[in-house]
């Protein structure tokens, strides 16, 4: 149990039977009344963000989480098989627990967050930016750069990304895994 005043970004708490990560907090001391903590909490399972206010003396159940690097090996049915890079144990992780799964390639290293007491995987985070080779895209027309037009491109993981017209097949691009957006072209 922790006091509400001890909540910081990244703190994991159990509330109403659900796990939440604190993504934003503010210690508020109004001119009149009691001091409180205004927080934004993200549901680990659904990703839903809610705002919650806690009185300073309020006790909360904290959950100890572990973050470890895992390497993606292969897909088996609906599960993805990952290897713990410290113990070399292999663990299946469900598709819906992996953020940015469309950009997952064999050998990629992800950060797996698990409940330390139960060893239950809460979610797996891809790196924020990944570099991938464009495997297919329509050729851009020469001189067609007057507008900021985007075209679909398929990358080596099979995902489709909207890219500028000047990107061609075989080029390596950088992608933001949070929203699947094009970040830039990688210089060779």
Swiss-Prot record:
Q: What terms describe the molecular function in GO for this protein?
A: translation elongation factor activity
Q: Kindly tell me the pathway this chain contributes to.
A: Protein biosynthesis; polypeptide chain elongation
Where does it primarily localize? cytoplasm
InterPro entries the UniProt entry points to: Elong-fact-P_C (IPR015365), NA-bd_OB-fold (IPR012340), Rib_uL2_dom2 (IPR014722), Transl_elong_fac_P/YeiP (IPR020599), Transl_elong_KOW-like (IPR013185), Transl_elong_P/YeiP_cen (IPR001059), Transl_elong_P/YeiP_CS (IPR013852), Transl_elongation_fac_P (IPR011768)
Where does it reside? Cytoplasm
What GO biological process, any one, is recorded here?
A: peptide biosynthetic process
Keywords, comma-separated and alphabetical: Cytoplasm, Elongation factor, Protein biosynthesis
* Gene Ontology, cellular component aspect: cytoplasm
Give one Pfam family, short name only.
Answer: EFP
What does the protein in this record do? Answer: Involved in peptide bond synthesis. Stimulates efficient translation and peptide-bond synthesis on native or reconstituted 70S ribosomes in vitro. Probably functions indirectly by altering the affinity of the ribosome for aminoacyl-tRNA, thus increasing their reactivity as acceptors for peptidyl transferase.
PANTHER family membership:
ELONGATION FACTOR P (PTHR30053), ELONGATION FACTOR P (EF-P) FAMILY PROTEIN (PTHR30053:SF12)
Family membership noted in the UniProt record: Belongs to the elongation factor P family.
HAMAP family linked to this entry:
EF_P (MF_00141)
Supply the name of the protein.
Elongation factor P
Species = Bacteroides fragilis (strain YCH46)
Classification from the root reads: Bacteria, Pseudomonadati, Bacteroidota, Bacteroidia, Bacteroidales
